[in-house]
């Protein structure tokens, strides 16, 4: 019997378009002899769309948003999920929601309450990894080296601009980066060379979050590692993008047709081993399961800095995460998706054995 696979995508997030591209690639790769695919599109306004069995043949990207909408968010969530998950048969949810309300533990909490297996990280690890400020505190406690950083809330900025700016200049200096604490895909990030640019960067970052992170710039390479698994995760060979951009922003990541990958990255065996071990340590530190991508900086002196851990990395067929696995152990894209589904089912089965009453 086919497993019913419910693919969640879209969502109330500035990373909505990234989610659509990811869902399109994943759905096309699914083996329809094993899975019956039901797309659940969430609009930018938060409305959930009725899932119908999808015809993968001839699928176009626009087909993923041409679905009927319900009248209200509360009604639609109840009708869509409860009616579907009450049906007999094996079922798994594949959340492909990037950023707010999808990668922060919100949807994961709902799926936990519904008691259905879902791919990827749980409530706690999703929340921890998306909040860069909290994540950095965890990494520091674990003794993992990071770049110098400061965290500011919006109320601190409103209370005293000059105090924030002075502290940032004294402790971080220039050039520096300003980031929203809880966004991915390099959205809302600015590279600043002086006070004027820093003010503009802080203002921009606060458009997307009420907490921001300032980081000292590291001159060097950006290295990425894919991690997969539950209690005993595996780390891929490291990879890096080869590009001429000083600042690898959203447009560079998703629009640059000249972007090239180097997998495995040209590193010594010692550095390669160190990166893979640190990636798994960070994965455990955040209580991750299923998958994550861990990003590092490597400066000219050979010093490694863990930049961030991404609980739902880019997952199109040209994204670094799936390509790193293909070049590490030959795992093809469709096989990778099935492995992640298997990890979700195993984690769910383990949770069912936990006793919740005395």
Where in this protein do the model-derived segments appear?
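Active-site nucleotide/adenylate-binding loops and adjacent lid/helix of ATP-dependent enzymes
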Residues: 2-9, 13-14, 21, 83-87, ...
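Phosphate-binding site of ATP-dependent enzymes
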Residues: 190-277, 298-305
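A glycine- and small-aliphatic-rich helix-loop capping segment at beta-alpha/alpha-beta transitions
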Residues: 109-118, 196-199, 327-329
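C-terminal active-site "lid" helix and adjoining low-complexity regulatory extension at the edge
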Residues: 270, 289, 298-358
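Short, basic/aromatic recognition patches
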Residues: 280-284
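ATP-binding N-terminal substructure of ATP-dependent carboxylate-amine bond-forming enzymes
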Residues: 1-119, 123-124, 128-130, 134, ...
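Residue-level detector of anion-binding/catalytic polar loops
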Residues: 36, 117, 145, 211, ...
């Amino acid at each position: 019997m086919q497993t019913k696979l419910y693919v969640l995508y879209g969502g109330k997030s500035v990373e909505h378009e990234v989610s659509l591209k990811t869902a399109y690639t994943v759905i096309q790769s699914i083996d329809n002899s094993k899975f019956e695919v039901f797309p659940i599109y969430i609009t930018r306004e938060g409305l959930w769309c009725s899932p119908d069995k999808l015809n993968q043949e001839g699928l176009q990207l626009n087909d993923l948003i041409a679905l009927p909408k319900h009248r209200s968010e509360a009604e639609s969530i109840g009708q869509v999920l409860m009616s579907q998950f009450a049906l007999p048969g094996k079922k798994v949810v594949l959340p492909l929601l990037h950023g707010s309300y999808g990668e922060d533990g919100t949807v994961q909490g709902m799926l936990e309450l519904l008691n259905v297996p879902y791919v990827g990280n749980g409530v706690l690890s999703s929340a921890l990894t998306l909040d860069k400020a909290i994540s950095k505190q965890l990494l520091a406690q674990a003794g993992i080296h990071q770049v110098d950083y400061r965290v500011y809330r919006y109320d601190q900025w409103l209370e005293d601009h000059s105090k924030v700016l002075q502290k940032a200049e004294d402790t971080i200096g220039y050039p520096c980066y300003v980031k929203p604490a809880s966004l991915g895909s390099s959205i809302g990030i600015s590279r600043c060379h002086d006070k004027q640019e820093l003010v503009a960067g802080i203002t921009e970052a606060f458009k997307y979050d009420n907490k921001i992170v300032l980081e000292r710039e590291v001159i060097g390479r950006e290295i990425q590692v894919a991690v997969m698994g539950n209690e005993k995760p595996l780390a891929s060979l490291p990879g890096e993008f080869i590009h001429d951009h000083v600042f690898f922003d959203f447009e560079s990541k998703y629009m640059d047709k000249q972007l090239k990958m180097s997998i495995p990255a040209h590193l010594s065996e010692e550095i390669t081993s160190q990166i893979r071990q640190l990636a798994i340590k960070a994965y455990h530190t955040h209580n991750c399961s299923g998958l994550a991508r861990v990003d590092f900086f490597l400066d000219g002196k050979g010093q490694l800095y863990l930049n961030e851990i991404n609980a739902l990395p880019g997952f199109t067929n040209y994204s670094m995460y799936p390509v790193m696995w293909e070049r590490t152990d030959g795992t093809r894209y469709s096989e990778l998706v099935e492995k992640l589904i298997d990890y979700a089912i195993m984690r769910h089965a383990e949770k069912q054995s936990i006793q919740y009453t005395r």
